[in-house]
């Protein structure tokens, strides 16, 4: 994650503060002097998620006088934890850093979790390319209870006051002397060196991992020791004089009892305990132990793992024998070789080369040990935390092949004419406020909520595609019923895949154009064009690879799911992916448009989202009409079997005929058009349309995002019992009439739900 995203998050924090405080003029001035971009966060919930402030937000709501802004929450957090320390942030007190996902920043982990070690290029920590383990990072970060801003200080303990470095009495002159001697070894000081008298801030990497809390023991020397070992080559290490080799161990003269006491006294193990234990191990693994630190030299495979201060003492953290295995690279996807191969394959698709997983430079004496000595404790990043993952966005690993450009006036005019029939028309408020947000009702978590009438056709089409992903693809195929109870992350992922399928299908499965709002005006409306505040702000992103499209939508899904223009953005993306020229060729009448009176969706728009072509009819193939004078009119219908089906009340009234390409789709999901409204009907049986025997008695589920539905509606369809068509239609729910256009004369049991009339 680059600095631009960090800057945008910070700007969003300021905008939220100004907005919540009612500083409207200041907000306007800020938007003028610093316009928003695609990376701007315009939703307060999204801002809390990015900064991981959910825990603080819940705590704040429970208070008698809750704060109103995220900036105040962060400020109060730091004041509560660090505002009362001695001298109020003196030179020895590190300044906390937010745990915001960014490059070269790691999420703190707990010792009880699975051991993970990330290896990457240590030659330049600020420019090193790091492997992204986004899903693992997210799962691990969600387990951080209480310390949401970086796990600095346990919420159940008062913060420690900053103390000077603890040393063994009488050893201070030796420490100072050793430090000065080692400082002379290099003419150019390393980036990690922080001299005892300097007033500089510690590195943010150390702060984020909680190393600034509690009594800090010999941290400057330890930092230099790590950097020193990193810069030392094998040849220089082997030929180093015995006198110089003793200078490094002299830095670690803090008492082990002090370190272990701070670890044992805490009820829960903190990162300080991990640091202390590993620091003790450093003392043991030193090539030559000083006289005042008696320890026997460990074999190479023992040096690759942390050990206890004594062989007979149990591990401080209660780790099992598994935890004492030789330290290797543990990644969710397998070992380092497998991970590197996957990265190489991914980068080969992108036409670039990945940064290799770093091979450790071993001392000559260690090379004979093979794999057991492949990773030494000194080779881990300078924070020495074993359980850590790198959280960074996908673009940092895979550079997407995306061509982006701002929309111009001519394109905006074409789109408006295609949508409304005139460039003077605009989207109404129902469209502007509609996005693809999911229901919070426990039994309807799969459902997309509709705020008002208007874009129901778009919502129903997207709902059908989301159900396709939830029920019949991926891991959900084994248990369709479980697919109706998705997690928030899973349903968002299915929404991403559904949107990707829609725009990719509209682009002929060769290209896709994704329209995103930038919050900045891209052109000045002139002439025969009426601005609506939406089209003028668009940035158009073209992609020619489906995998890149999914990744891009995953990064931008908040604009579609949270909004406010999610429904509009998808509609425009489908239009631009298909192109305005081809859509006009799809129409029976070239002057047709996609949005009708009162903002209702036309059949052409629904067909565009379901099949990728904006044809005007629902029958199969093409019908030729001969007027008798030699002129033949072509009426275009559905060209192939659709993934999602369609049923219409108009067919019951003999006003249209729905062909089998829509009546019998690949998946048992149907968009239902009834009374100028679109809703969804689906089955949990994937074989419903493949085996006629399953169509004797089966269940269908009905969902209407606009009906304020509070419970699941399950209909039982019985085709063995026929219902007379002469029944008074005024008393028959229109939904039953739509169902009988597919299953003639079938009886419909609402199973206790109130029939929708």
From Swiss-Prot:
Biased composition, class Polar residues, residue ranges:
254-277
Q: What EC identifiers does the entry list? A: 3.4.19.12
Extent of Low complexity compositional bias: 232-242
Q: List the disulfide bonds.
A: none
GO MF, any single term:
K48-linked deubiquitinase activity
Q: Does the keyword Phosphoprotein apply?
A: yes
This enzyme catalyses: Thiol-dependent hydrolysis of ester, thioester, amide, peptide and isopeptide bonds formed by the C-terminal Gly of ubiquitin (a 76-residue protein attached to proteins as an intracellular targeting signal)
Instruction: Enumerate the InterPro entries for this protein.
Output: MINDY-3/4_CD (IPR025257), MINY3/4 (IPR039785)
Superkingdom field: Eukaryota
Tell me the GO BP annotations in alphabetical order. Answer: protein K48-linked deubiquitination; proteolysis
Pfam families documented for this protein: MINDY-3_4_CD
Q: Which UniProt keywords apply?
A: Hydrolase, Phosphoprotein, Protease, Thiol protease, Ubl conjugation pathway
Q: Which family does it belong to?
A: Belongs to the MINDY deubiquitinase family. FAM188 subfamily.
Q: What does this protein do?
A: Probable hydrolase that can remove 'Lys-48'-linked conjugated ubiquitin from proteins.
Which PANTHER family does the entry link to? UBIQUITIN CARBOXYL-TERMINAL HYDROLASE MINDY-4-RELATED
The protein, known as: Probable ubiquitin carboxyl-terminal hydrolase MINDY-4
Origin species, per record, is Homo sapiens
What gene name is given for the protein in this entry?
MINDY4
């Amino acid at each position: 994650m680059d600095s631009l995203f960090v800057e945008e998050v910070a700007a969003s924090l300021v905008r939220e503060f100004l907005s919540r405080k009612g500083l409207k003029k200041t907000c306007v001035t800020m938007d003028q002097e610093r316009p928003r971009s695609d990376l701007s966060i315009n939703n307060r919930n999204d801002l809390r998620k990015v900064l991981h402030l959910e825990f603080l937000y819940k705590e704040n709501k429970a208070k008698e006088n809750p704060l109103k802004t995220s900036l105040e929450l962060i400020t109060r957090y730091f004041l509560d934890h660090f505002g009362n320390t001695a001298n109020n942030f003196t030179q020895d007190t590190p300044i906390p850093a937010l745990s915001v996902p960014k490059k070269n920043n790691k999420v703190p982990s707990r010792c009880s979790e699975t051991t993970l070690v990330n290896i990457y290029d240590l030659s330049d920590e600020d420019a090193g390319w790091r492997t992204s383990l986004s899903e693992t990072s997210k799962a691990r970060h969600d387990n951080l209870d209480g310390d949401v801003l970086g796990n600095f200080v346990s919420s159940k303990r008062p913060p420690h006051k900053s103390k000077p470095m603890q040393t063994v009495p009488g050893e201070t002159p030796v420490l100072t002397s050793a430090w000065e001697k080692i400082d002379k070894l290099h003419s150019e000081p390393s980036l990690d060196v922080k001299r005892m008298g300097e007033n500089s801030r510690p590195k943010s990497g150390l702060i984020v991992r909680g190393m600034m809390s509690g009594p800090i023991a010999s941290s400057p020397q330890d930092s230099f020791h790590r950097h020193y070992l990193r810069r030392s080559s094998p040849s220089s290490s082997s030929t180093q004089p015995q006198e110089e080799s003793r200078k490094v161990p002299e830095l670690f003269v803090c008492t082990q009892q002090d370190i272990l006491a701070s670890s044992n006294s805490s009820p829960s193990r903190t990162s300080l305990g991990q640091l202390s234990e590993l620091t003790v191990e450093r003392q043991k693994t030193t090539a030559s132990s000083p006289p005042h630190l008696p320890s026997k030299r460990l074999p190479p495979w023992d040096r690759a793992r942390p050990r206890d201060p004594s062989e007979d003492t149990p591990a401080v953290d209660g780790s099992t024998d598994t935890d004492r295995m030789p330290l290797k690279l543990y990644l969710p996807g397998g070992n380092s070789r497998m991970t590197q191969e996957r990265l190489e394959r991914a980068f080969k698709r992108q036409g670039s080369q990945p940064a290799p997983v770093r091979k450790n430079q071993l001392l000559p004496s260690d090379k004979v040990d093979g794999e057991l000595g492949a990773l030494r404790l000194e080779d881990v990043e300078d924070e020495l935390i074993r359980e850590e993952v790198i959280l960074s966005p996908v673009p940092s690993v895979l550079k997407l092949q995306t061509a982006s450009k701002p929309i111009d006036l001519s394109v905006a005019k074409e789109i408006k004419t295609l949508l409304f029939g005139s460039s003077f028309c605009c989207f109404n408020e129902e469209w502007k406020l509609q996005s693809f947000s999911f229901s919070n009702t426990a039994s309807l978590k799969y459902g997309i909520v509709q705020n008002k009438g208007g874009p129901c056709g778009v919502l129903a089409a997207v709902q059908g595609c989301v159900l396709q992903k939830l029920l019949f693809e991926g891991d959900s195929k084994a248990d369709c019923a479980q697919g109706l109870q998705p997690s928030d992350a899973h349903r968002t992922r299915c929404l991403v895949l559904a949107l990707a399928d829609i725009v990719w299908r509209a682009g002929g499965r060769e290209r896709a154009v994704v329209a995103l709002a930038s919050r900045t005006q891209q052109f000045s409306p002139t002439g025969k064009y009426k601005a609506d505040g939406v089209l003028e702000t668009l940035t158009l992103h073209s992609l020619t690879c489906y995998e890149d499209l999914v990744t891009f939508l995953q990064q931008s899904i908040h604009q579609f799911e949270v909004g406010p223009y999610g429904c509009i953005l998808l509609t425009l993306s489908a239009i631009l992916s298909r192109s305005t020229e081809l859509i006009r060729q799809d129409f029976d009448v070239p002057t047709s448009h996609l949005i009708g009176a009162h903002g209702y969706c036309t059949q052409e728009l629904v067909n565009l989202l379901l099949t990728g072509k904006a044809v005007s009819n629902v029958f199969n193939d093409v019908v030729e009409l001969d007027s008798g004078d030699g002129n033949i009119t072509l009426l275009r219908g559905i060209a192939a079997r659709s993934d999602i089906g369609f049923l219409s009340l108009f067919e019951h009234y003999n006003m249209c005929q729905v062909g089998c390409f829509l009546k019998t789709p690949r998946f048992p999901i149907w968009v239902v058009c009834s009374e100028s409204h679109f809703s969804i009907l689906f089955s949990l049986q994937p074989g419903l349309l493949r085996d006629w025997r399953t169509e004797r008695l089966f269940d269908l589920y009905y969902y209407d995002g606009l009906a304020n539905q509070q419970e699941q509606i399950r209909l039982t369809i019985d085709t063995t019992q026929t219902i007379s068509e002469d029944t008074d239609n005024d008393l028959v729910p229109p939904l039953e009439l739509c169902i009988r256009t597919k299953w003639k004369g079938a009886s419909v049991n609402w199973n206790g739900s109130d029939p929708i009339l």
